[in-house]
């Protein structure tokens, strides 16, 4: 029995992101969490849903028997499905738009047309280092509900996932270190307590405290706080490096 199947839900000749071929929405079978937002449906030329029957309802290869590995394997299957496409948007089923302002997406589309990239995230937590007035590089990435991934990068990720027996977390283990983001969070998710939430790395109570303090368990505008903190961490890193270099110079004297 095939544990995954696909359904096309929209096609357009006037996508918001002209440099993206396809959007794949990763959804559990029988889930009602996805909001059929016309903006999401028109992000790219074609939008499909990948339905996942789940490891409890459908026996999967590689002994997939826990939530974290099932999430990684689900991305792996989506990468297999999209082998013939160039840039692809991947959205988890609870992803939703924070900002609809078209000019933000136009800047992202222009960036993709002029620059090589591996992964662009529409909203993540991490350490942000400024590239220019609009874009940041992301280290220590967490949260992967909405990203654009290039064709070459998907091939590399699929191999790494399989070689690693689908262990780890999609964002922290596989996406980290090659990610860029826009200056504002654009496509976000809320973080109610779920089975997947309870499988995250790190201290569960610290994770939960951060979610409550930022408000992203109930209000998507809390992502503004996450982005402010992520940018601040990037600035602090630069300050730490400068202090280290100054101390090193004085030590050598």
Regions found by a protein language model. Give the residues of each.
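An acidic/histidine-cluster motif and surrounding catalytic segment
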Residues: 1-91, 95-253
């Amino acid at each position: 029995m095939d544990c995954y199947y696909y359904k096309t839900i929209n096609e357009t000749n006037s996508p918001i992101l002209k440099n993206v071929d396809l959007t794949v929405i990763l959804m559990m079978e029988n889930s009602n969490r996805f909001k059929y937002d016309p903006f999401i449906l028109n992000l790219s030329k074609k939008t499909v849903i990948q339905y996942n029957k789940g490891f409890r309802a459908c026996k999967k290869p590689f002994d997939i028997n826990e939530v974290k590995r099932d999430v990684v394997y689900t991305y792996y299957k989506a990468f297999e499905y999209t082998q013939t496409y160039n840039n692809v948007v991947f959205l988890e089923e609870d992803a939703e738009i924070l900002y609809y302002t078209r000019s933000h997406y136009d800047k992202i589309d222009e960036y993709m047309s002029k620059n090589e990239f591996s992964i662009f995230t529409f909203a993540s937590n991490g350490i942000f280092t400024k590239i220019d007035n609009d874009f940041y590089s992301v280290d220590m990435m967490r949260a992967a509900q909405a990203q654009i991934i290039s064709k070459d990068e998907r091939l590399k990720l699929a191999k790494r996932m399989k070689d690693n027996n689908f262990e780890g977390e999609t964002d922290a283990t596989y996406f980290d270190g090659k990610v860029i983001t826009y200056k504002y969070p654009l496509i976000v998710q809320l973080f109610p307590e779920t089975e997947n939430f309870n499988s995250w790395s790190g201290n569960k109570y610290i994770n939960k405290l951060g979610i409550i303090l930022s408000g992203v368990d109930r209000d998507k505008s809390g992502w503004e706080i996450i982005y402010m903190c992520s940018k601040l961490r990037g600035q602090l890193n630069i300050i730490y490096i400068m202090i280290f270099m100054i101390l090193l110079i004085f030590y050598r004297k």
